[in-house]
A protein has these predicted regions:
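Beta-rich carbohydrate-recognition and catalytic domains
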Residues: 2-144
Length: 144
């Protein structure tokens, strides 16, 4: 153990770890549960910050991507609004992946990558066979 004038390096490391954990729990947005992946589409819209993120809401493992949605007025306190995007059409039936958000004339526009597996892996429905998939850039709008 390294010590300088009664100062314990190991004790300071432990204090630092606790402080980092405390700050991380306060300042890092976490989904209410299950798998969380890349943040997408951070935007300030109608008086709130909106954060979208890739999310598999059914298990704590990677799966067919959805977009979770959280809002904040101060970037510290977040309210989770649930799933914002979910696979709902042929072009994104196997996941809603990375994208962005922009505002134009009071309307929020979400752009994202939809994925469709041409051959699904029979051992894991969340994977395609032999990288055989198509992707499409998709767009939707919201006024609320």
């Amino acid at each position: 153990m390294l010590s300088f004038s009664g100062f314990s390096y190991r004790r300071q490391q432990e204090r630092d770890r606790k402080e980092i954990k405390h700050m991380k729990n306060r300042l890092h947005v976490k989904a209410p549960g299950n798998w969380v992946n890349d943040p997408n589409g951070m935007i300030y819209y109608k008086g709130q910050y909106h954060l979208f993120y890739q999310h598999f809401p059914y298990a704590p493992r990677w799966g067919t991507m959805h977009w979770g949605h959280a809002v904040s007025r101060d970037l510290v306190h977040w309210e989770h609004l649930g799933v914002a995007l979910f696979p709902s059409k042929d072009e994104d039936q196997n996941g809603c992946f990375s994208g962005s958000a922009v505002e134009e004339n009071g309307v929020m526009h979400l752009f994202y990558t939809g994925v469709h597996y041409n051959q699904v892996n029979p051992k894991d429905i969340h994977q395609c066979l032999d990288q055989d998939f198509t992707s499409a850039q998709l767009h939707l709008t919201s006024k609320d």
